[in-house]
């Protein structure tokens, strides 16, 4: 409520009230978690406006029985190429851009593997106060070549039985398995929760 109120505050009084409400919410959350009030306040402040789920797009690119993964600079673990969808992009535009930026490959989207509720994946690394949906696309390479970026210092293809340590809030083994199933059986329906 405080986030929406701050976004639409009509005057200084409203801003003060909603700021105080956000402070109280941070105090309550910090008492029920391992986070300090300052950490909670910072997290709240990073997401102004109406609270809606964020959209994470990921690409499953399978070549010669191996799946493309990128190493994340932020945690040193591996994930499917992708990231937050930008405002104004269609989902397919977002994933094509993300794959090019993170791996160097140009791709075409073949179909949607799944739509996942990212917060329902059990792990301790996910954003504690925000909700996200993950859209997983099966893509094929049209061109380009593997190259690293400032976000992804390494790019590689991995067999399902030889996966490196995964960045779990970005990519988990279950969605990789769904991608392999979709690649083997094109008539398999989209996975959704």
Feature-to-residue mapping (PLM):
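Nudix hydrolase/Nudix homology domain
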Residues: 1-18, 24, 77, 150-193
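Short alpha-helical scaffold segments that flank and stabilize functional sites
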Residues: 5-8, 28, 62, 97, ...
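Acidic, metal-coordinating catalytic segment for phosphate/diphosphate chemistry
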Residues: 12-15, 19-58
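N-terminal strand-loop-strand
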Residues: 41-79, 107, 111
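Short, highly charged low-complexity linear segments
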Residues: 54-66, 128, 170-180
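Unchanged
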Residues: 85-109, 117-175, 191-192
């Amino acid at each position: 409520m405080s986030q929406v109120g701050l976004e639409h505050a009509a005057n200084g009084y409203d801003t003060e009230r909603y700021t105080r409400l956000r402070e109280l919410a941070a105090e309550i959350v910090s008492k029920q978690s391992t986070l300090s009030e300052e950490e909670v306040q910072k997290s709240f402040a990073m997401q102004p406006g109406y609270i809606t789920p964020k959209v994470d797009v990921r690409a499953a690119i399978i070549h010669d029985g191996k799946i493309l993964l990128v190493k994340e600079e932020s945690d040193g673990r591996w994930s499917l190429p992708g990231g937050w969808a930008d405002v104004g992009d269609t989902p397919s535009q977002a994933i094509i851009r993300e794959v090019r930026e993170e791996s160097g490959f140009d791709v075409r989207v073949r179909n949607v593997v799944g739509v996942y509720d990212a917060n329902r994946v059990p792990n301790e690394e996910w954003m504690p106060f925000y909700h996200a949906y993950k859209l997983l696309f099966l893509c094929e390479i049209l061109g380009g070549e593997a190259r690293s970026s400032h976000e992804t210092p390494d790019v590689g293809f991995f067999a399902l039985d030889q996966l490196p340590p995964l960045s779990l809030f970005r990519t988990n083994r279950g969605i990789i398995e769904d991608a392999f199933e979709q690649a083997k059986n094109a008539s398999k329906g989209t996975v959704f929760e």
